[in-house]
Design a protein with these regions (language model features):
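Nucleotide/phosphate-binding catalytic cleft detector across ATP-hydrolyzing
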Residues: 1-4, 26-131, 149-288
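Gly/Thr-rich phosphate-binding beta-strand-loop-beta motif of the actin/hexokinase/Hsp70
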Residues: 1-24, 128-147, 166
């Protein structure tokens, strides 16, 4: 069994994979929660028991993290409870070991682990396509791939971050829970914030896709991440929504680093559910 960690700015997602890469179970921990390697192990162990998983069967740990100040907890967890040195998803690990991502020569080195695993996953899905990846997280990121070369990208605030920015920097605007607006004509403060942020995001994403298409007219646009499924319904330029792209990419990173002889593995066949929406094909790889 392989244990992956997808550490984002909002949530930490532990992922239990079998040797073929099928996801056995996942759960979420708030990133801001204070914990040590001991409390983390207790959470993992209790969850594994609830899913009838034997935690002693974990043979490797892969960590994709965009929160460096908590990485040490996961290093200590691996060493103390599993006698494993966790492998972190980094650009050096990709470039030096598996050669799956080439960086455009003039680009500064700063590609985060979350974007690396997204790229590895889409390159596995569509090795021959020009690809634009849109990941709807705390920030919404755009990454352009052509001929296995990372060409660049951009970052805009995500929906939750936009709501928090309004609340934190104004005296009278409330902090609200985001809900999909029924109309752009908000009738109170909360509905107006929802409408403005939602349709503002839709509009900015459409415009950014348009700008990328000027340089890469054949780009195939893939969306992923929390709010991505709903927003994708409003953006006809998005070709496909893949809900677990990061989790797929973490195992692909493991496979390329540790299982090179197993060129494909069973796992990538996944469990596929196809839905028709906006005349495009949507994929749910793992039915958990």
């Amino acid at each position: 069994m392989i244990l992956g960690f997808d550490i984002g700015n909002t949530h930490i997602v532990p992922i239990f994979y079998n040797e073929d890469g099928n996801i056995l179970a996942t759960f979420r921990i708030p990133t801001h929660l204070e914990f040590t390697e001991d409390t983390l192990f207790i959470m993992l162990n209790e969850f594994a028991k609830s899913k009838n998983l034997e935690i002693s069967n974990i043979k490797n740990i892969i960590v994709s993290s965009v929160v460096p100040n908590i990485n040490e907890n996961f290093i200590r967890l691996g060493k103390k409870y599993f006698e494993i040195d966790p492998t972190f998803v980094t650009l050096d690990n990709v470039e030096n070991k598996i050669k799956e991502i080439k960086i455009f020569p003039n680009m500064e080195r700063g590609l985060g682990a979350d974007r690396i695993v997204d790229i590895l996953a889409v390159k596995k899905l569509y090795p021959e396509k020009e690809l634009l990846i849109i990941d709807f997280g705390t920030a919404t990121t755009f990454d352009m791939i052509k001929d296995s070369t990372y060409m660049g990208g951009c970052i805009i605030p995500g929906i939750a971050l936009s709501i928090n920015a309004l609340f934190s920097n104004t005296a009278a605007l409330p902090k609200i829970e985001f809900t999909e607006p029924e109309t752009v004509l908000g009738i109170n403060t909360a509905s107006q914030i929802n409408a403005g942020i939602f349709y503002g995001n839709v509009g900015s994403i459409k415009e950014l896709i348009l700008q990328y298409k000027k340089f890469f007219p054949n780009a195939y646009v893939i969306a992923t991440g929390g709010q991505g499924e709903k927003i994708s319904e409003y953006i006809e330029q998005i070709n496909e929504y893949v809900p677990k792209l990061g989790e797929m990419g973490i195992f692909e990173f493991y496979r390329l680093n540790f299982l090179k002889e197993n060129s494909d593995g069973i796992w990538w066949k996944g469990i596929t559910v196809k839905n028709e929406r906006n005349n495009e094909r949507y994929i749910n790889w793992f039915n958990i």
